[in-house]
Regions:
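The canonical Cys-X-X-Cys-His
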Residues: 30-33, 75
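Thiol-based oxidoreductase modules, predominantly thioredoxin-like and allied folds used
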Residues: 5-7, 25, 44, 48-62
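N-terminal leader/targeting and pre-domain segments
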Residues: 1-21, 97-105
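Structural micro-motif
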Residues: 67-76
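Typically the conserved alpha-helix immediately C-terminal to a functionally engaged Cys/Sec
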Residues: 34-46
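Chalcogenol-based redox active-site neighborhoods
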Residues: 35, 66-67, 92-93
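Non-catalytic, surface beta->alpha helical segment in thiol-disulfide oxidoreductase systems
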Residues: 77-105
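Short pre-active-site segment immediately N-terminal to redox-active cysteine/selenocysteine motifs
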Residues: 19, 26-29, 71
Length: 105
């Protein structure tokens, strides 16, 4: 999983201008993020049509505010530069919940 460098929303949308992406918003201190993180390699393998990008909330706080990421862990799907879906809240997310979200896009 690629780790996103610090950038603003406009630069991010340029980066995501072609293809399908899942942005995984997380932070090292977040217990719910640590809960889902071990499942991410398997989720990535099962959804290989997407490129997964890890976004560290603390390194990209302005981007998170601009994108209205109000809780972590959160997932935002982009296709060809446009946001397609989001699973954004402050609740713990299970592997099944993330997979169900991605299956329903």
């Amino acid at each position: 999983m690629e780790k996103l460098a610090k950038m603003d929303k406009k630069a991010l949308e340029e980066k995501l201008s072609t293809g399908k992406y899942v942005l995984f918003f997380t932070a090292d201190w977040c217990p719910d993020c640590r809960f889902i993180k071990p499942a991410m390699p398997e989720i990535e393998a099962n959804f290989s049509q997407f490129e997964f990008i890890l976004v560290n909330r603390d390194e990209n706080i302005d981007l998170c505010q601009e994108m209205m990421i109000m809780g972590i862990p959160s997932f935002v799907v982009y296709e060809d530069g446009k946001e397609k879906a989001r699973f954004v809240n402050k609740d713990r997310k299970t592997k099944k919940e993330v997979e169900d979200f991605l299956n329903n896009i």
